[in-house]
């Protein structure tokens, strides 16, 4: 209960920060954003499009999702839409309950970061039956037709993990700590990683000592499971982690054993702490995802789909980058942004984009 109250207050502060004042059409959360497209503008409050945004709370406590929400809500308001945000602290059951609540709030479109990409399918089917379009944000919901999916190429993220580790440790012992088993992205990342490292496993240059999976995207769970591995052995040369929170857990445990910086560790999301670890020399690489781009693109897509579903035939839906299968019998129009591998030598990329400030990144470096 206390955790839910803290999240509620935190969310309120974020929304106030991102949505106060008149929007200039120039920046959202310090990032360059195109001015509102006239064809997406709503004519008045009584006809205003309402977007429902359902976020699995377990993901919201991860740093990058705070940025996604601020950019998305700011861009949606630039386009004349209102956004109802619901955080599901109780897992998939609460997320389903909150989705049903938003249906009754007359939302024109639903955007979902799913807690469980399979168990949520029934609720999404009800949304579709109500005539409401659905966009899966970052996590491709399985088993039900979707109007769109927007994310980054998770297989490419896995390949970026693999390339970074193979360049740094072409021969050695590897540990792989995958993300949540409830998130299809975890499996895509794993497939991309193995695409790169498996040839070296097969020829004997790389020994995959352990590969483990987490139930949730949880740094606490990662600490527990990685510690259990380290109780058996710390004889590793490289560790691939599903995200930066997991990488942080691994590096914390390595630090306790005076091994931080001696083992190559990679993650994703370009969390501030990860960028700090990179310049400090304890993390090799993080995968940076330009949240400003995906947040704005998602807002534009959601508004276009919502207005189109409401009967505005003048709206043109942007062409997808590709279509993906989600075991629903239909292909999902998918909008995928590119990610960048960030090392110490190119850390300025996250600074130039305004993702983090130079002072923050180099705070612990003298």
Annotate the PLM regions:
Residues 117-156, 166-167, 173-179, 271-277, ...:
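Flexible loop/hinge segments that line or gate small-molecule binding clefts
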Residues 57, 69-72, 83, 160-203, ...:
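An alpha-beta-alpha
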Residues 15-18:
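C-terminal motif of bacterial Sec signal peptides marking the signal peptidase cleavage site
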Residues 111-128, 193, 215-277:
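Hydrophobic alpha-helical
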Residues 54-70, 85-94, 116, 139, ...:
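Hinge/beta->alpha junction and helix N-cap segments in small-molecule ligand-binding domains
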Residues 1-7:
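Bacterial N-terminal signal peptides that target proteins for export
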């Amino acid at each position: 209960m206390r955790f839910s109250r803290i999240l509620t207050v935190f969310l309120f502060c974020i929304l106030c920060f991102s949505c106060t004042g008149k929007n200039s059409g120039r920046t959202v959360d310090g990032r360059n954003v195109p001015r509102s497209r006239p064809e997406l503008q709503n004519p008045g409050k009584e006809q205003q499009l309402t977007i429902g945004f359902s976020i699995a709370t377990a993901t919201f406590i991860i740093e990058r999702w705070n940025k996604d929400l601020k950019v998305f809500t700011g861009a949606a308001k630039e386009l004349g839409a209102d956004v109802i945000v619901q955080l599901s602290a109780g897992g998939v059951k609460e997320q389903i309950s909150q989705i049903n609540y938003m249906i009754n709030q007359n939302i024109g479109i639903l955007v979902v970061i799913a807690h469980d990409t399979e168990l949520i399918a029934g609720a999404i089917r009800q949304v579709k039956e109500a005539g409401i379009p659905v966009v899966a944000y970052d996590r491709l919901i399985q088993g039900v037709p979707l109007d769109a999916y927007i994310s980054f190429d998770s297989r490419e993220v896995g390949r970026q993990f693999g390339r970074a580790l193979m360049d740094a440790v072409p021969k050695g012992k590897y540990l792989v700590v995958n993300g949540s088993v409830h998130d299809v992205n975890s499996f895509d990342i794993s497939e991309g990683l193995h695409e790169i490292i498996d040839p070296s496993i097969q020829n004997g240059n790389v020994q995959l000592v352990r590969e483990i999976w987490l139930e949730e995207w949880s740094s606490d769970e990662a600490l527990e499971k990685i510690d259990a591995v380290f109780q058996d052995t710390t004889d590793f040369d490289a560790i691939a982690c599903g995200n930066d929170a997991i990488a942080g857990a691994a590096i914390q445990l390595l630090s306790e054993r005076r091994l931080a910086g001696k083992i190559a560790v990679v993650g994703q999301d370009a969390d501030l702490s990860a960028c700090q670890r990179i310049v400090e020399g304890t993390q090799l690489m993080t995968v940076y995802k330009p949240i400003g781009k995906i947040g704005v693109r998602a807002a534009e897509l959601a508004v276009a789909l919502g207005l189109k579903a409401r009967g505005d035939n003048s709206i043109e839906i942007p062409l997808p980058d590709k279509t993906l299968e989600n075991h629903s019998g239909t292909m999902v129009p998918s909008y995928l942004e590119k990610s960048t591998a960030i090392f110490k030598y190119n850390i300025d990329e996250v600074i130039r984009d305004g993702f983090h400030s130079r002072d923050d990144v180099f705070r612990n470096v003298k």
